[in-house]
Amino acid sequence: MELHFDIGGAATVTVSGVEGRLIERLSTLMQPWRSSDRTDTDVRIDLVQGDPPPADDLIGDTGDGRRLGTTPGRAWIFIDDGWWSIADGAGLEDIEASVRLRPSRLVSEVIRPAVMTHVGRAGGVTLHASAVVDADGPMLLAGWSESGKTETALAFVEAGSTLLTDKWTVLRPDGGLVRLPGPVYVRGWLLQHLGSLRDGLTTRMRAQRIAARTAGLGPWMVRRLPGDAASDLADRLAVIADLGDRLRVDPERLAAMTGTPVVGATGPATRLVILRSRPVDSITVIDRRPEDVIDDLIASSAFERRSTSDLAVRAAYADPPVDLRGLDVHAAEHAALGTLIAAVRVIEVRAPFPTDPRRVRDAILAHV
């Protein structure tokens, strides 16, 4: 069976070989986009049975859990017990993936990066930014990792705005904003500040929070033991506890929790907020010129997407080499971004993180 997805006019995706429970699972993971009747495709992924041919050269895991192998004209990426492959030239209509690849991996490792690549080739940009829609139109909330994009966006939702995107926002060539498929991850500490989210937790989410708090005792107990090995173990346990305290919320569930609609695409942004972290407990807001923030926006996006562009480096080193340089579209995005945000009001916010995101929200509203 083939599933076709129209990602808000930014790209069309076809996934073939989808059978059984994977149909429902993939449809859920692709929210808010539903399977459509469109058969034209920008990105095509064929799910296949069996194992790939033996690689002529295999580059081992470099810390991201992935290995890359090559055969003449094709690169193969292995992760967990699955794999996916792409042809020389980084052709987005010739991607294969093992049916054993976890559905969440299929979306995060294959579909979403492929859509981003197509967007960049087609004259659009994928920003490392959340986005909300309020009475004044769409607003982008951009910034480096751990700057408060998700938290600030959800604080706006608490005040009546609608969440468009979390973490990644596509700017089509016409400037329209589009949501990529994927859930929202809500940190446990955020719930003390946002009542609608706290009150809307499911039983499973509440159980996860209890488990995360219990796991959080592990690092404290282990650090009481002597030696570097105990310290290293405590650090690993702290990472696990932090991941456990992040609640995965699908778009439709978030809409039900907050009483807001699910929105997948809007017109162009009217405001762009650059969030920066600072080590003092005060918030400052200033205006910036659009042309002065382009480098920062592209740098943040490139860093967060380095796992994709890094594949080109590995594939070029392998023997036989495979050319995947087409996966890196940041130069094209840099050239396009100036036009796409030329008429957008840009402000920069410096605030501590973590903090009550309502403070950041209110500072933005007071300035604009």
Which role does the model predict for each range below?
Residues M1-S145, L154, E158-A159, T169-V368:
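A noncatalytic interaction/capping subdomain that flanks phosphate/NTP-handling catalytic cores
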Residues S147-K149:
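Conserved glycine(s) of the Walker
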Residues T162:
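Residue-level detector of anion-binding/catalytic polar loops
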